[in-house]
Swiss-Prot record:
It comes from the Bacteria. Pathway: Amino-acid degradation; L-histidine degradation into L-glutamate; N-formimidoyl-L-glutamate from L-histidine: step 1/3. This is Histidine ammonia-lyase. GO terms for molecular function: histidine ammonia-lyase activity. It catalyses: L-histidine = trans-urocanate + NH4(+). It holds the Pfam family Lyase_aromatic. The gene is hutH. InterPro entries: Aromatic_Lyase, Fumarase/histidase_N, HutH, L-Aspartase-like, Phe/His_NH3-lyase_AS. There is a cross-link at residues 141-143 (5-imidazolinone (Ala-Gly)). Belongs to the PAL/histidase family. It is found in: Cytoplasm. It is an enzyme of class 4 (lyase). It comes from Bacillus cereus (strain AH187).
Length: 505
């Protein structure tokens, strides 16, 4: 059980919450702050003060005063009218993440909701009732209004949820779990939907997958180095310390550890003086992608614990301030950066695939075919990889450079951060498939070189891979092989043992 405080949530905890289904509870001190802040909102309503989002309309209607008797209707109307999401739903892990992050930001005690609202969000998390949230429709400022409105709907007993493996009406799940839908009161609708939790939840899942994929890329690249009898000198510690990038040094170190007892790597001048860049520059390129990942992780962990709604309440109600923390620009930039960093792992992987299948670049059978000419072998796998990296180049175009004014030009600059997050996740799926193709080719090359000559680590990795797909002894439908390896990499290859390279993988 992970305790939410509003201040301390980490990526490592989100892994447990999203991928392992761990439960959550609220810190009592944080809940006390929530209750105290709520008293301020109720006094504002009682006194009839004019405060944006509490006693006024929203967006361009911020100058419209709402009567005390209409405050509840205002919140309900807000949720229904803003639930304009379209397209396929986010993965369940993302909608679960949205619930967790929304509760966490409310626990900072500056949003003005009742403790009841926070508790309801946590009930949904712990009972694994996950909102069906369409992926499209957010501008990323004022936050993720449309996606979060679909999240808020289910608290009211409206909309749809994923529950026990099925997509059902929210009331079906609430009834089965013995929960009553809530009725929103002053400010609560706005507090639920005005924030960056859709782009951030998708960003967190993307980061978690990207981190695992980046480690896997090192094991796969190491197997390719063996298949091509690569020069190990290029990974010498002195080379990488001379440049000074920590991540580059770490990648080189891990690859040296993976290959330390390999009989397939060569020394400088033994077969050739230098390798091509796609082998020789693995630490430089992969290391640069790790720099991106480290940047993204830092920004996500800030945003996961950020108050992103509007207005915010401070000093016991002395200050109720309309600001712009809902603006998703920091996450938009981070996700666009993640797109580029991950796309580059696929770019260099595809070039290594080419070196594995092109007989002009190696002494292996053409296209790793068991019977060149009669059988095409891995020829079209390289085409597929080329297609995926080309698609990534389109997806990697920065969403954050775009902005379209909305709400009659009141909201005249927006982040498009949710688009960036969604595209980052798609790029990661493509990268994993490119790496899957490289792994299939590298395993085949290893067989030609002699499996007994592989390092202890790559040999273990090879045998696990062969449990997913057989050797290429005849042409077959290779799309199945690619998807099988990709699924295995995504779901069954633990990164927890990534640094213990002598352990069984």
């Amino acid at each position: 059980m992970i305790t939410l405080t509003g201040h301390t949530l980490t990526i490592e905890e989100m892994k447990r919450l999203l991928l392992e289904g761990e439960g959550v509870t609220a810190c009592p001190n944080s809940m006390q702050k929530v209750a105290e802040c709520r008293e301020v909102v109720e006094k504002i309503v009682e006194d009839g003060k004019v405060v944006y989002g509490i006693t006024t309309g929203f967006g361009k209607f911020s100058d419209v005063l709402i009567q005390k008797d209409d405050v509840k209707a205002l919140q309900h109307n807000l949720i229904q009218s803003h639930a304009c999401g379209i397209g396929d739903p986010f993965p369940e892990e993302v909608s679960r993440g949205m619930l967790i992050l929304r509760a966490n930001t409310m626990l900072k005690g500056v949003s003005g909701v009742r403790p009841l609202v926070v508790n309801m969000l946590l009930e949904f998390v712990n009972r694994k009732i996950h909102p069906v949230v369409p992926q499209q429709g957010s501008l990323g400022a004022s936050g993720d209004l449309a996606p979060l409105s679909h999240l808020a709907l289910v608290l009211l007993g409206e909309g749809e949820v994923f529950y026990k493996g099925k997509r059902v009406h929210a009331m079906v799940a609430l009834t089965e779990e013995g929960l009553e839908p809530i009725e929103l009161e002053a400010k609560e609708g706005l507090a639920l939907i005005n924030g960056t939790q859709a782009m951030t939840a998708q960003g967190v899942l993307s980061y978690i997958e990207a981190e695992a994929t980046a480690y896997q890329a090192e094991f796969i690249a190491s197997m390719t180095i063996e298949g091509l009898q690569g020069i190990i000198d290029a990974f010498d510690e002195n080379v990488h310390k001379a440049r000074g990038y920590k991540e580059q040094v770490e990648v080189a170190s891990r690859i040296r550890d993976i290959l330390h007892d390999s009989k397939l790597t060569t020394k400088q001048g033994e077969l050739r003086v230098q390798d091509a860049y796609s082998l020789r520059c693995i630490p430089q390129v992969h290391g640069a992608s790790w720099q991106v990942l480290n940047y993204v992780k830092e920004k996500l962990e800030i945003e996961m614990n950020a108050a992103t709604d509007n207005p915010l309440i401070f000093d016991g109600g002395e200050k109720v301030i309309s600001g712009g923390n809902f603006h998703g620009q920091p996450i938009a930039f981070a996700m666009d950066f993640l797109k580029v960093g991950m796309a580059e792992l696929a770019n260099i992987s595809e070039r290594r695939i080419e070196r594995l299948v092109n007989p002009q670049l190696n002494d292996l059978p053409p296209f790793l075919s068991p019977e060149p000419g009669l059988q095409s072998g891995a020829m079209i796998m390289q085409y597929a990889a080329a297609s995926l990296v080309s698609e990534n180049k389109t997806l990697a175009h920065p969403a954050s450079v775009d902005s379209i004014p909305s709400s009659a030009n009141q909201e005249d600059h927006v982040s498009m951060g949710t688009i960036a997050s969604r595209h980052a996740h798609q790029i990661i799926q493509n990268v994993r498939r490119v790496l899957s193709i490289e792994m299939i080719c590298a395993m085949q090359a290893a067989e030609y070189r002699g499996i007994e000559n592989m390092s202890t680590v790559t040999k273990s990795f090879y045998h696990q891979g062969r449990q997913q797909v057989p050797s290429i002894t005849n042409d077959r439908i290779f799309s199945t092989d690619i998807e099988n390896i990709a699924y295995w990499l995504k779901t069954n290859y633990s990164i927890k043992e990534r640094l213990d390279v002598n352990a069984a993988l």
